[in-house]
Structure formats: structure tokens, C-alpha cells
Amino acid sequence: MTNIRKTHPLLKIVNSSFIDLPTPSSISSWWNFGSLLGVCLIMQIATGLFLAMHYTSDTTTAFSSVAHICRDVNYGWLIRYLHANGASMFFICLFLHVGRGIYYGSYMFTETWNIGIILLFATMATAFMGYVLPWGQMSFWGATVITNLLSAIPYIGTTLVEWIWGGFSVDKATLTRFFTFHFILPFIITALAMVHLLFLHETGSNNPSGLNSDADKIPFHPYFTIKDVLGILVLLTILTAFTLFVPDLLGDPDNYISANPLNTPPHIKPEWYFLFAYAILRSIPNKLGGVLALILSILILAIFPLLHTSKQRSLMFRPITQVLYWILVADLFTLTWIGGQPVEHPFIIIGQLASILYFSIILIMMPISGIIENKILKLN
């Protein structure tokens, strides 16, 4: 008799995705982040669900409802900090996952890559709206500043901002709709993640060499399930350490002050995982230009397949582009640091130079280095 996992309509989907999936034998730990992102998503939905049971999305009670969760709900503090730090772990895994995709040329699977970009945008939107919910100072002013950027859109900008706010300022209507969207988006992300996997399984996984690995594949289970379990244990260890020892390390102390529209915090800044984009936004002295640069800083990922000039897929055997890649990584760290600094000398000029370097490496230097490497290796 054929095994039920191969015949049952539902189980055979699971089987072909996680059990009998032919996987390149050479994929390294950099391929673990997909499963880690899945774990992060499930964990965020679970903790978020329990938080939503006690949270109230009203401007008068939102801040105190979060305090109530931390003080009075059984293990409420744990759920709240797992959710907050879980978001940080989510973004660490996301950035590493995208970074792996760029390094090993995984963007050549264009459908998978494009769904991934949509997933990245959806996750960023979810995280931004979640940051508004505790209704602290940084929540309120972050929401005000970021939504206000849309007013830079010619002609319809102001109307659009007021439409999103549901009034003439960030208020009760804004908080309620942000809570609604923050609740629904993770489920949309889950659906998109399934589509992401569907497209990936059409082509099969890439591997570190960037070469065709059809001749050397092994079943996903048990080899990679056990490898993923190790990754998950490491992830949970780091998350637990953060949650129990330094729960507020990645947050902003200003968010422990209840939202006050009459008092602006000295430095308005988003969560750490948006700082690189925030630095690019601030480095352009024009509002519309800044907004465009902000969007393009992430949307630029979509043209990676078009900018690929090398005859090799991966950077594994491309030392010149490798150097550029790691300069790009260092540049992103620099932008993240600048995003958290006040707008004054020398941070302004450093931010502008780092922003120029970011776009230059991706749009100019990497494509040129690909052509140079082809010439050196006589691959044309």
C-alpha cells in the first residue's frame, strides 16, 4: 500500500514541500532563514493574538491597556516582550535572507524574488503599524511623521494623508484602523509566504556554487529538517535571552511616555530595522525626493535580475564583486547608525555619502565588476 502521505490530498502537498522535496546537498546554513522566518511569523501571530485579547485600540485607553497587559495579565509581560523582540528577530532573519539571495544570485528566480519583495514591504508595513499601537510618544510622532511623507505626492498628497488619518491629525480613527490592518496583514503575509514557496518549488532551491544541482539532490527530511531544528533552537535562544535579560534594549525609552500631541520628542526615529531607509530619506533635502529615495532603497531589489551582468550566478567565485558586496553591507550598517543620530554635522554629510554609495554600488559598480570578471575569466 502506498504511504498515506503520498496519496492524501492535503498530506501530499506537505510531503512534496517538506519531506520528499529534492534539495541540493550543498546548501549551507544561509538557507536556514526561510524556515526561521516561518517560525517567526507563527510566533508573532500567536503572541499577537493573545495581546489582542487584552489590548484596546482607543486613544484614551491604548497606553494603559499595554501597561495592564504587562502588570496584571498572567505572563503578559512575557507575551508583550516576545512580540516586540520577535519583530526584531523577524527583521534580522529577513535581512540575512535577502542578503543571502543577493550574494548567491537567488534573485534569478524572478517570481520567487518578486513575491519576496512584496513580502518585505508587507512586513515593514505591519511592523510600522504595530509600533503605533502602544500609543507612546514615539508611536504617535512616528505615525505623524511617516504618514505625513505622503503629503509630498503632488496634487493629491494632503487629501491622501487626511484620508489615511481619518481626520486632520493622527487620532482615534487612525489608531483603530492601524490596529485593524496590523491584525489582518500577518495572515496576508502567511498566504504570500505560501505563494513564495510555491514558486520556489517550481524551480527548486539554488545552492552556494550557483550551478545546476539536479545531479546531486537529497530528500529534505531528515537531512534539512534536523538542520532547521538547530537553527530554530539558536533563534529561540537569542530571542529568549533578549526577552528575559534586555527586553527594552532595541526599543525607545520615549515610548514609555504616553502620547502627547503638544510635546514633540527631541529625536523622532523609527525602530532600528527602519533606520537605514530613514537615513536615506533624511539625506535628501527635498521632501518628494526623500520619499522617492526611501521607496527606491527597497524597490531597487526588483531590478537585481536586470543588473546581473556576470556569466556566473553566485558571488562564490567572484572576488571583485564580493568586495563590493561587503562594502554594501558595511554601508547599510553605517546608514542604520546615521538614522539613529540627530540631524547635525557631521552626521548629515556621512548620511548623504552613505546614501550615494548605496545606490552607486548596486546600480553602477556591481554590474561593471560583473563585466570585468567575465573579461578576466574569458567568459564572454
Swiss-Prot record:
Cofactor: heme b
Residue positions binding heme b b562: H83, H182
Matching Pfam families: Cytochrom_B_C, Cytochrome_B
Compartments where found: Mitochondrion inner membrane
Residues annotated for a ubiquinone binding in this entry: H201
Gene3D superfamilies named among the record's database cross-references: Cytochrome Bc1 Complex, Chain C
Keywords: Electron transport, Heme, Iron, Membrane, Metal-binding, Mitochondrion, Mitochondrion inner membrane, Respiratory chain, Transmembrane, Transmembrane helix, Transport, Ubiquinone
Cofactor: record remark: Binds 2 heme b groups non-covalently.
GO molecular function terms attached to this record: metal ion binding; ubiquinol-cytochrome-c reductase activity
InterPro entries xref list: Cyt_b/b6_C (IPR005798), Cyt_b/b6_C_sf (IPR036150), Cyt_b/b6_N (IPR005797), Cytb/b6-like_sf (IPR027387), Cytochrome_b (IPR030689), Cytochrome_b_C_euk/bac (IPR048260), Cytochrome_b_N_euk/bac (IPR048259), Di-haem_cyt_TM (IPR016174)
Record carries keyword Nucleotidyltransferase: no
Transmembrane segments: 33-53, 77-98, 113-133, 178-198, 226-246, 288-308, 320-340, 347-367
One GO process term, biological-process aspect: mitochondrial electron transport, ubiquinol to cytochrome c
Binding site for heme b b566: H97, H196
SUPFAM superfamilies per UniProt: a domain/subunit of cytochrome bc1 complex (Ubiquinol-cytochrome c reductase), Transmembrane di-heme cytochromes
GO cellular component: mitochondrial inner membrane; respiratory chain complex III
Membrane topology of this protein: Multi-pass membrane protein
Superkingdom assignment: Eukaryota
Remaining remarks: Heme 1 (or BL or b562) is low-potential and absorbs at about 562 nm, and heme 2 (or BH or b566) is high-potential and absorbs at about 566 nm.
Quaternary state and interactors: The cytochrome bc1 complex contains 11 subunits: 3 respiratory subunits (MT-CYB, CYC1 and UQCRFS1), 2 core proteins (UQCRC1 and UQCRC2) and 6 low-molecular weight proteins (UQCRH/QCR6, UQCRB/QCR7, UQCRQ/QCR8, UQCR10/QCR9, UQCR11/QCR10 and a cleavage product of UQCRFS1). This cytochrome bc1 complex then forms a dimer.
PANTHER family the UniProt entry points to: CYTOCHROME B
Function: Component of the ubiquinol-cytochrome c reductase complex (complex III or cytochrome b-c1 complex) that is part of the mitochondrial respiratory chain. The b-c1 complex mediates electron transfer from ubiquinol to cytochrome c. Contributes to the generation of a proton gradient across the mitochondrial membrane that is then used for ATP synthesis.
Similarity comment: Belongs to the cytochrome b family.
Protein name (database record): Cytochrome b
Organism of derivation: Brachytarsomys albicauda (White-tailed rat)
